[in-house]
Amino acid sequence: MKKLLCALLCVFLLSAALPVLCEDPEEELSMDEIVEAVDLDAPEAGEWTFPVALEDLNPDFVRLANKHYLLEKDYYTKPLVKVKALKLKNGENTNGGVRKASGGTMELQQDCYEALVALSDAAREDGYNLYLKSAYRSWQTQNTMYKNRLKKNNGKDDGWVSKAGASDHQTGLGCDVIPKSWLKASGMNSKMAKEPECIWMAEHCQEYGFIIRYPADKEEMTEINYEPWHLRYVGIPAATYIMENGLCLEEFNDELQAAIQEYLENGGDRSKVEKLIQVPNGEYKGKTSF
């Protein structure tokens, strides 16, 4: 409404002033020509124009972790929730648990865990059993895994294990979810994408706030091989936008940071976006005007 009123005021002022400003005083512009001169799509001062509303963007949920945006050793210090092994009675989930690929302790952020339970329950109702293979990993654990992978590959990073600080798992929002047929497999690879469970996850994960973190056609951007099993919780609004537009989290972050910069340049309140700002701190440090 404010934008419309401003536009109408501009039209009124232009209609009064333009006859005077014209090179030929007798030449008057039509109303259509005057309206064309007014940019109705120009953002208002301090207006947030990104497709996902500010109130729907949780800084923790959309935090990017890769080798250019490294997490600190103590990045997440809030209590994590221990994953419960699913207990069923008459087909109903009686303890708010999920199927686990192993008996070890696994932890996630609360919102992510609740969403994973909901997603797993929905999959089971559709005839698919999902198993959580891996959840939160500390910086130290990831560092050990990365070094072991390098040793196995003669010092070469083959794109299967992230370096410490670059792993989604350190956020407490990354989940490796696999079908039963892969429980005894010695490793995981992109062939898993053909499994009905993974096809179901790719089609429905955004409904529960998850994205496929490392898509098949985005390896150059993520610098990680395609992982159809790796879900990342970002919240339903962000997940819907990312999946519907075929983005990876890196592309989403690029768009988000550009929107933040535009918002601030137009007089936006910095305190509203401060925690969403991310600056490269890893192998490549790009320019930023934040």
Where are these regions (language model features)?
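Extracytoplasmic cell-surface/polysaccharide-interacting catalytic and binding patches
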Residues: 22-135, 139-290
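Intrinsic low-complexity, intrinsically disordered segments enriched in polar/basic residues
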Residues: 2-3, 204
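Sec-dependent N-terminal signal peptides of Gram-positive bacterial secreted proteins and lipoproteins
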Residues: 3-22
